[in-house]
């Protein structure tokens, strides 16, 4: 997979299961890649907007980040709000279950969230 760095995100493509190709984009900030999601129907833009809004909030603690089942879907939740939902395609690309992937993403975010300093 080739990756092109553009500002806060990395864009790439991944061939999977023969003829099926997914567009995968990674959310990265200050050199830390938080997660790579399948960008279906511009889903990445929504996740990036949510992350940008999160970066403007003062006092977010690692304990505010969790993995939770919301309406039957595994998600990364910050202060009770869904940041990203793990899709079947995400789990397939990462070769794991949706639950495990949401736990990995939540851990990565919680390990680094306190180092994100709001600019305002």
Q: Which residue ranges define each predicted feature?
A:
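Positively charged n-region of N-terminal signal peptides that target proteins for export
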Residues: 1-4
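Alpha-helical protein-protein interaction elements
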Residues: 6-9, 97
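Hydrophobic h-region of N-terminal signal peptides that target proteins for export
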Residues: 8-17
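N-terminal targeting peptides and non-cytosolic leader segments immediately upstream
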Residues: 18-120
């Amino acid at each position: 997979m080739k990756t092109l760095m553009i500002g806060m995100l990395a864009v790439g493509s991944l061939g999977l299961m023969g003829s099926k190709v997914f567009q995968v984009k990674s959310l990265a900030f200050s050199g830390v890649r938080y997660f790579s999601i399948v960008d279906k129907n511009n889903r990445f833009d929504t996740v990036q907007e949510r992350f940008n809004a999160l970066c403007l909030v003062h006092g977010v603690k690692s304990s505010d980040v969790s993995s939770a089942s919301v309406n039957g879907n595994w998600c990364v939740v910050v202060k009770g709000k869904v940041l990203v939902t793990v899709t079947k395609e995400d789990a397939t690309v990462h070769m794991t279950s949706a639950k495990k992937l949401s736990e990995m993403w939540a851990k990565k975010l919680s390990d680094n969230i306190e180092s994100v300093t709001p600019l305002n």
